Design a protein with these regions (language model features):
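Ferredoxin-type iron-sulfur electron-transfer modules and their immediate structural context
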Residues: 1-147
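Residue-level detector of alpha-helix initiation sites
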Residues: 90, 154-156, 179
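Fold-independent oxyanion-binding glycine-rich loops
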Residues: 121, 153, 176-177
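Short acidic, glycine/serine/threonine-rich loops at helix termini
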Residues: 122, 162-163, 184-186
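N-terminal Rossmann-like FAD-binding beta1-loop-alpha1 element of flavoenzymes
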Residues: 147-173
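Glycine-rich FAD pyrophosphate-binding loop
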Residues: 169-185
Length: 186
């Protein structure tokens, strides 16, 4: 872990919301721009717990490798942090925004202090991935010859389709509505 005393030295600071009067006029992000210096500081608050509950069944439902990408953000190794994030999360650019951040509720630091700003860090990592073109199509090296049908194109259906495609299967996604996305669209 990067800064072993970061949790003692720094208080939690999250990105503030944009003013409501601005937000009602557009569909842009509700938070202000990320402050990269603050993000590194916030990532340094991760304590390298013996048992990181943030990424266990008590915390993140997709088992994100939270302490690992916190450390990489602290070290300013953003692309590696992005690679860790997408190992466990098919859509971090979406889940980082809609997730209720149970990982923060499970953060051990939260027992005595405010928890690490995990949700903000996840959003910042995925935003950097979008800005720098790190999201890439990754077709499988070999096809299995098997075909799979996925019913429903919401986050779960699209995640399943992506994982099955990585495994080499030919995947067809079926959706009853006029466009894909499920709850992300309607």
């Amino acid at each position: 872990m990067g800064k072993t005393t970061g949790f003692k030295e720094f208080k939690r600071v999250v990105e503030p919301y944009r003013p409501a009067k601005e937000r009602v006029l557009d569909f842009k992000e509700i938070y202000t721009e990320h402050d990269e210096n603050n993000l590194g500081t916030q990532a340094s608050r991760c304590m390298d717990c013996g048992v990181p509950f943030c990424q266990s069944n008590e915390g993140c439902p997709v088992y994100n490798l939270i302490p690992e990408w916190n450390d990489l953000v602290y070290q300013n190794r953003w692309e590696e942090a992005f690679e860790r994030l997408i190992k466990t999360n098919n859509f971090p650019e979406i889940t980082g925004r809609v997730c209720p951040a149970v990982c923060e509720g499970a953060c051990v630091l939260g027992i005595t202090e405010t928890p690490v700003a995990i949700k903000n860090l996840e959003c910042a990592i995925s935003d950097k991935g979008l800005e720098n073109g790190w999201f890439k199509a990754t077709p499988p090296k070999n096809r299995s010859g098997k075909k799979v049908a996925i019913i429903g194109s919401g986050p779960a259906g699209l995640s399943a389709a992506q994982e099955l495609n990585y495994a080499g299967h030919t995947v067809s996604v079926y959706e009853r509505d006029d466009r894909i996305g499920g709850l992300m669209m309607y």
